[in-house]
């Protein structure tokens, strides 16, 4: 079985939300606690990439390493967070999750990691017709491609995917719940989440 480590991205500024999303409460836990718990159902090695302003608070909530972006690429978006996690944890594959999808299911993570195949460099879900690169798995060899993009001041996940051999998987063939993929960017979306019954 391939070794898989988890990387949780909590380094954003949460400007639209108005406060750190990682620390927002839902169903008795903060978003970051919930996502780490879900990942721990599937894998042992997990690291959280945190913004410096909340690193200490996040570290008190969870029992996995909490680090910041590599200094040279600090604040350069999700690519910087992913490569920082790859440098911190040694694995063949890395499962990624942002901190603002608190209803993500361990069933879904198992389905994605179950698709891992060294013929590919990334396993990316497509949900309701949209690619979800921050809820995918990446091979360790992608690390050098991320460095190259960052050095060229290219930060988008789509640019990374365009340089990778990607296996796209659709949720249509599985029994998934749409609420698993609810992404919370605003207070309005948070209010909607609070009204959703957890599946």
From Swiss-Prot:
Species, as recorded: Bacillus cytotoxicus (strain DSM 22905 / CIP 110041 / 391-98 / NVH 391-98)
The reaction(s) this protein catalyses: Mo-molybdopterin + GTP + H(+) = Mo-molybdopterin guanine dinucleotide + diphosphate
SUPFAM superfamilies hit by this protein: Nucleotide-diphospho-sugar transferases
CDD domains from the UniProt entry: MobA
Keywords: Cytoplasm, GTP-binding, Magnesium, Metal-binding, Molybdenum cofactor biosynthesis, Nucleotide-binding, Transferase
Domain of life: Bacteria
GO terms classed as biological process: Mo-molybdopterin cofactor biosynthetic process
Name this polypeptide is given: Probable molybdenum cofactor guanylyltransferase
Similarity field: Belongs to the MobA family.
Cellular compartment(s): Cytoplasm
Reported function: Transfers a GMP moiety from GTP to Mo-molybdopterin (Mo-MPT) cofactor (Moco or molybdenum cofactor) to form Mo-molybdopterin guanine dinucleotide (Mo-MGD) cofactor.
One GO cellular component, as annotated: cytoplasm
Lineage, highest ranks first: Bacteria, Bacillati, Bacillota, Bacilli, Bacillales
